[in-house]
Amino acid sequence: MSYCKIEAPYPEAEAGEKRIIFALDPKGDEVEQEQCMLQLIPGRVLEMSRNDAANHQTLGGSIEQHTVEGFGAKFFHVKLAKQAVSTLMYVHAEDHGEKVRKFVAMSNAPMFPYRSRYPVVVYLPKDAELRYGIWCGGQQMQAATE
């Protein structure tokens, strides 16, 4: 079983960005390669009216995967749109101007291979937040036959 090593010379965060580093629990090489995926979900916590919060918001953006030369360690660079897009349903008759804070995620957050050998290193805008999901399946699915 492999364990997280922070040996690679990851680049420093650029101006206006921050670097987030976290480790994934080892699950065994076979399980990590065949059954698990990591989903990075960057976004921003935005203040909005109760009416707007009842609608579905999303941020445009992208996640680029890079490799630290000579180490094989991966890192990710996030670009996020400044403005969220939203559905426009009218929900509350009396909004009263109340403001709420809501996490708005990047649309179509991609999945990446689960690798506990190295830490997960993500560069994103300073005003952004990173959440993540770990997806693990069981045994391989089989096709149904007639």
Swiss-Prot record:
A Pfam short name: Ecotin
The organism's place on the tree of life at top rank: Eukaryota
Entry's InterPro entries?
Ecotin_sf (IPR036198), Prot_inh_ecotin (IPR005658)
Question: Which SUPFAM superfamilies does the protein's record reference?
Answer: Ecotin, trypsin inhibitor
Please name the GO terms that the record assigns under molecular function: serine-type endopeptidase inhibitor activity
| PANTHER family the UniProt entry points to | ECOTIN, PTHR35890
Query: Family, per the entry?
Result: Belongs to the protease inhibitor I11 (ecotin) family.
**Protein name according to UniProt:** Ecotin-like protein 1
